[in-house]
Amino acid sequence: GSEMCIRDRRKEGISIPIIVMNPEFSSFNVLFENQLEPEVYSFRLLDAMIKETERRGITSYPIHIKIDTGMHRLGFQPEDVPEVCRRLKEQSGVVARSVFSHLVGSDSYIFDDFTKKQLDTFTRVAAELEAGLEYKVIKHILNSAGIERFTDYQMDMVRLGIGLYGVSASGQKGLRNISTLKTTILQIQNVPAGDSIGYSRMSYVKRD
């Protein structure tokens, strides 16, 4: 599974930092054994990480603080930052290497006002975190569409997702697709104009 894949990558000499998104408590052994850096999104997970580093006698283990600026899946709330700083400063087991958030609709112009609000919130919260911790952290929020459309917010790092496959989330033509989908035509039907095709009747035929 994924644990074997990670171990194999480390054995092959891949030594660069690897961030683990949405880690589970049951994965702590794999995290520490393979020097993986977890996303930390809640006080429960933060406290568990601190406790585990203390148990193992580890100091300054890198973690990545996730802030919820509008996706509402995982992440600390912006108002949690002072308490996050307090808990980090009163221990030595973990250290914040980066702070990040996730954009909801950076691929669509209709969400630009909301995206700008997310970007402004993150900029403010990241500065508050750095001020509270009294050291600099890596800041990143842009996904594939954000990289293309909000270049002023590339900060210290960006996260290229679907763009790795040459697919533009916002219709840009500068990326080269790395894969090709091929299939075989099994049947050709004559469908009268006005009839629907496929699930949920989402597509209608305009002509015979």
Stretch-by-stretch model annotation:
Residues G1-I138, Q154:
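Active-site-proximal beta-alpha core segment in soluble small-molecule metabolic enzymes
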Residues D112-R207:
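Anionic-ligand-binding alpha/beta catalytic cores of soluble enzymes and soluble regulatory domains
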